[in-house]
């Protein structure tokens, strides 16, 4: 009886909000039939309260639907209910009650349910434009629809939630382009965006003004790059010439022209990323909307000049007016506003990408002029070429001829910063030995003008020192004969290279202080430079250092001998030549000329502190405690640990340890206060009194006896004052 008295709209709302999907599906099908049958007659129509009940049931029908595909299907079915209503007046009331329901229920939607209602708003707005399209975009129908949006959503008096209002502004032009992009004219489009012009002029919410400017007017400016060059006057002349067929033909031509322009814009890449996204969206949805930019600028200027327009709104509208005026004149939209920072950022990124593509073909001279910025790829190539030189060129390279003795200091100074060839000036005997083969042509060592990175200086300095320490046996024997001449030349060169030698000693502090203490190789085969078939001395091939086993003699160029002496930080950066042997300057030859061995071998690192025996400090004096009969301990450890009471001795008779059986007549049980009733385990035993209650013989009931003083003072522990 209760269900029979309820209205049909209430019953529909209950069944639409059911937790069972079958009940909801049947309710939606019956609602579709009910709306069609109720609005067929002219007299039969819905009231606002009845449609609010139906929309509330549809809202919760969408709420309980969880699967995404089923949500999209249900949103399509709900939005299609507008076309089931036969009365035009009931259709707009159906749309109005939808927006009222969304405003009322929006605050209770959580994040998980938000996307489905965004989709429902978009689809209902699209079907609302479909209603206008079926009515041939009549001006009266457009006015009625825009009044509903202005009253329920955009107006400040509507108190619509910001989420509903913002989402409507975001999807308005997109859905309008999807439905009427091929049919709407510039005047109709200007009328459809007129509510946003009014709300941008009179609202006091700065966020809403920015949202309208970005979501509506900035989109129109951005899509201007995708609109073909067809004037509004031509469209008007086509419309005035004849009726609908000419308009349809013009629309078809416009669609084809717009698609071609879109393809050209996207292919040439002349537009920004934001415009590209808008053009791609418009290409998928159809042809873009046509706007008369001069009419839009005039409308915005009119509302901006109103006295009731706030200053912030007027300033924002004036920037939009300048953009539309520039579009009307044929120029691109200026990028002076703060909203165009994103486009500037994208243009900078495109410019950087183009520069990086062109950077691969830049000449070396341009690299030097750019302030020392070298490309990463070229750095890697230079690094590989530094450690892995060409084998063919090294085989053909020979030691160059030595100039006169007058030019020796100059050549030494030029070769020192170069770092390409680590060859120093030879001795007088070495010059004579090379002069014997001067009749044969010797190829000149090529000098590369590549700039070296600063972090390679340690490596090159260490190579020069290592190569100077390994000398041929023949030169060492000859050096003893002409020691006087070599000492004079060494003194001349050492004065110019004194500063560099000090720096090398600082960097390689692990090497011995005096170079004379280093041993000289005394093998059977001399380690002289490699001689070719023609008698030309060639440089050996550079190889990377490899780990070697420890030997009895110390090789200055062997990295394994210097391993315990070189710090960890320098071991990572220094890579030495293992087989390369070059000639050295006379100063270094004289310093290394002696055949003495090292006085002290290099020691491995010991512990910082090492204690062989345990150290126990001895006290300065010892004072015996008063009234103590204990003897003085013998050792110092006994003085610190033992006290007079520590002389007691306790013994345990383990042979008398026996386990006793439990007996009820045990004397320990008889001594207990409960007597025979106390057993080992009695499950039926209960406590005599509670926790908060006291026994009859409580200490409070017994009289206090006078405190007795002890006859003798107890023996106390010694204090610190007893020892001093």
Curated annotation (Swiss-Prot):
GO terms for molecular function: transcription coactivator activity. It is found in: Nucleus, Nucleolus; Nucleus, Nucleoplasm; Chromosome. The modification Phosphoserine is found at residues 336, 370, 432, 438, 494, 668, 672, 698, 701. Citrullinated by PADI4. Positively regulates DNA damage-induced apoptosis by acting as a transcriptional coactivator of proapoptotic target genes of the transcriptional activator E2F1. Likely to play a role in ribosome biogenesis by targeting serine/threonine protein phosphatase PP1 to the nucleolus. Involved in regulation of mRNA splicing. Inhibits SIPA1 GTPase activity. Involved in regulating expression of extracellular matrix genes. Associates with chromatin and may play a role in modulating chromatin structure. Belongs to the RRP1 family. This is Ribosomal RNA processing protein 1 homolog B. It comes from Mus musculus (Mouse). The lineage of its organism: Eukaryota, Metazoa, Chordata, Craniata, Vertebrata.
């Amino acid at each position: 009886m209760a269900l029979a008295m309820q209205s049909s709209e209430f019953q529909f709302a209950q069944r639409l909000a059911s937790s069972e999907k079958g009940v909801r599906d049947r309710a939606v099908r019956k609602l579709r039939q009910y709306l069609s049958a109720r609005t067929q007659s002219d007299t039969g129509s819905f009231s606002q309260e009845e449609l609010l009940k139906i929309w509330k049931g549809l809202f919760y029908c969408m709420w309980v639907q969880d699967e995404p595909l089923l949500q999209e299907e249900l949103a399509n079915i709900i939005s299609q209910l507008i076309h089931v209503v036969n009365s035009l007046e009931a259709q707009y009331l159906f749309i109005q009650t939808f927006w009222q329901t969304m405003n009322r229920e929006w605050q209770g939607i959580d994040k998980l349910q938000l996307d489905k209602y965004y989709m429902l708003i978009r689809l209902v707005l699209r079907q609302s434009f479909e209603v206008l399209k079926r009515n041939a975009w009549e001006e009266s129908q457009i006015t009625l629809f825009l009044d509903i949006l202005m009253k329920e959503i955009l107006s400040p008096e509507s108190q619509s939630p910001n989420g509903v209002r913002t989402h409507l502004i975001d999807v308005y032009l997109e859905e309008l382009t999807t439905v009427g992009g091929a049919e709407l004219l510039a005047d109709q489009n200007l009328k459809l965006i007129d509510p946003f012009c009014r709300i941008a002029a009179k609202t006091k919410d700065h966020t809403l003004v920015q949202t309208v400017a970005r979501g509506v007017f900035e989109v129109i400016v951005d899509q201007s790059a995708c609109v073909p060059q067809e004037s509004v006057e031509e469209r008007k002349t086509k419309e005035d010439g004849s009726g609908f067929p000419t308009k349809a033909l013009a629309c078809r031509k416009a669609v084809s022209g717009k698609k071609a322009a879109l393809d050209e814009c996207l292919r040439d890449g002349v537009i920004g990323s934001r415009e590209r996204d808008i053009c791609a969206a418009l290409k998928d949805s159809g042809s873009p909307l046509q706007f008369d930019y001069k009419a839009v600028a005039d409308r915005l200027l009119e509302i901006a000049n109103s006295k009731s327009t706030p200053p912030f709104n007027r300033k924002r509208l004036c920037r939009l007016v300048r953009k539309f005026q520039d579009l009307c004149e044929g120029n691109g939209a200026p990028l002076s506003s703060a909203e165009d920072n994103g486009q500037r950022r994208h243009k900078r990124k495109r410019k950087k990408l183009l520069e990086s593509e062109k950077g691969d073909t830049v000449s070396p001279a341009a690299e030097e002029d750019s302030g020392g910025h070298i490309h990463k790829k070229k750095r890697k190539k230079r690094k590989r070429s530094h450690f892995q030189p060409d084998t063919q060129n090294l085989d053909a390279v020979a030691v160059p001829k030595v100039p006169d003795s007058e030019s020796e200091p100059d050549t030494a100074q030029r070769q020192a910063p170069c770092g390409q060839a680590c060859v120093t000036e030879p001795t007088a005997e070495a010059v004579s030995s090379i002069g014997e083969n001067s009749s044969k042509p010797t190829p000149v060592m090529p000098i590369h003008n590549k700039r070296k990175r600063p972090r390679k200086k340690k490596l090159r300095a260490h190579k020069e020192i290592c190569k100077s320490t390994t000398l041929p046996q023949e030169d060492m024997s000859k050096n003893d004969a002409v020691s006087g001449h070599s000492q004079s030349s060494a003194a001349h060169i050492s004065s110019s290279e004194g500063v560099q030698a000090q720096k090398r000693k600082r960097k390689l502090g692990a090497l011995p202080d005096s170079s004379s203490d280093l041993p000289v190789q005394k093998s059977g085969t001399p380690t002289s430079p490699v001689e070719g078939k023609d008698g030309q001395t060639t440089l050996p091939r550079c190889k990377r250092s490899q780990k070697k086993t420890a030997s009895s003699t110390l090789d200055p160029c062997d990295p394994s001998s210097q391993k315990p002496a070189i710090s960890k930080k320098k071991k990572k950066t220094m890579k030495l030549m293992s087989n390369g042997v070059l000639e050295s300057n006379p100063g270094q030859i004289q310093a290394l000329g002696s055949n003495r061995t090292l006085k002290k071998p290099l020691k491995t690192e010991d512990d910082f502190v090492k204690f062989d025996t345990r150290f126990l400090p001895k006290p300065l004096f010892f004072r015996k405690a008063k009234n103590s009969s204990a003897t003085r301990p013998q050792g110092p450890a006994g003085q610190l640990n033992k006290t007079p009471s520590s002389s007691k001795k306790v013994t345990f008779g383990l042979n008398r340890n026996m386990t006793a059986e439990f007996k009820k007549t045990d004397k320990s049980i008889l001594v207990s206060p409960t007597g025979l009733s106390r057993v080992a385990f009695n499950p039926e035993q209960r406590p005599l009194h509670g926790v908060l209650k006291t026994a009859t013989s409580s200490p409070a009931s017994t009289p206090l006896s006078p405190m007795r003083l002890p006859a003798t003072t107890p023996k106390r522990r010694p204090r610190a004052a007893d020892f001093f």
